[in-house]
Amino acid sequence: MWRGKKIGIALSGGAARGLSHIGVLEVLRDMGVEAKAIAGTSMGSIIGSFLCSGITLDEMEEYVGSMDWKSFLLFSDLALSNTGIINGRRVERQLKKFLEDKTFDDCKIEFCCVAVDILTREKVVLTKGRLMDAVRASISIPGFFSPICLDGRLLVDGGLIEPLPTEAIKALDVDFIIGSSITFKKDSERYRYLLEENCQLKKDQTYAYHNIGISNNDKFREMISRFRHRVRKNNEKTVSVQSILDTSMNIIHREMASRYTELADILIEPEVGDFGFFDLTRGKEIIQRGREAALAKAGEIKKKLRLR
């Protein structure tokens, strides 16, 4: 191993898909990789803060495995405000169960997380104060979670500027950076398919309206039958509010992440494009994707870090 060298790990955002970082970290642990510093953005800040404050990966996975659809209610408190549809108090209560009132100084592994000052449009790297407050700032997706006021700044999700916090981890004077950044190749295929299917449904509707008279009952019934079949077939695969939100966040992540992935000495990219933004109930599967991505890079990791 790189004796005396400081290894840092950067964990990207990604909402539920960011749970894949747990699988990545498990593989790195089993390989004997010892991180001296961790930086997180959004979901990466949750996982990073938990690990650095002493919560084990096994404990995290156990909690994720216990989630069901009701778990979403534990994080959702609708807010009738102009700043976000979710107030964030329930999220804060859940974070406090794990982080209590621990501060950055209590961390066993050096930690920082990234947020954005929505007023000045500046990146803010948080390194002091209560972990819970810093994480709450880093996960505050604009328009979704209400922003948090911290040290005179109005803070939102760090993924707007630095979705993979390699610059933040580099500032902690690390010698080697491992980045874990989610990717969405399957997502692109899925939404291209949905777009084609929805466009075809529109064409069928238009054709039926303009070209088939009501008097031509056989053709009309055939067209309606085909149309209904396509609707049933795609009943669970429609372009919904969630799919639009998923795709929007993916676009932001893709466009912004490229400049930060280049700073990583090793880049691990869990393929989680077929999972949704809120797929907390599929956490075990998402974690497994992280394991698979890290194992695929095991040879490169061993070579670069001179592991046996």
Residue ranges of predicted features:
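Patatin-like phospholipase
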Residues: M1-T41, S49-R308
